[in-house]
Amino acid sequence: MNLGLIKMMNKDYNGAREAFGSAANAEGINEAMGVYYLRQGDYQTAAKAFGDSKSNNAALAQILNKDYSAAQSTLEAVRAPNATTYYMMAVVAARTNNEQAVYANLRKAAALDASIKDRAAIDKEFANYNVANL
């Protein structure tokens, strides 16, 4: 599986797929395949590959499939949420018109990573929100 991850990092997607196929029963293979399909732009297959995984990547696949309820549940279940987790929760909140959650999650993200403020200020996801004063 590690060979597949290295090949994927080097944008050798055919080689990555072959290596992942050889590691079909390896721990973490579903997560790796999910990332593979995300990079290929096959978001539906990515979401299926992640299965019940509770990770930022799994939530990203769900967001890109417009399954915001599943993405919210996944993000809430992430074991060690980080700035990206909260930023993604803010994206879900923006896409579901939950203004209070947008601000609450962006504040949590910015508390963990101050650069989030600058990112949110130019992110079209938050164009309808005043994120300048996080």
Residue ranges, per PLM feature:
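Terminal, low-structured helical/coil segments at or just beyond the last alpha-helical repeat
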Residues: 103-134
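Canonical tetratricopeptide repeat
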Residues: 2, 32, 57, 88, ...
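Residue-level recognition of tetratricopeptide repeat
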Residues: 5, 35, 59-60, 91
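Start-of-helix register in tetratricopeptide repeats
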Residues: 28-32, 53, 60, 84, ...
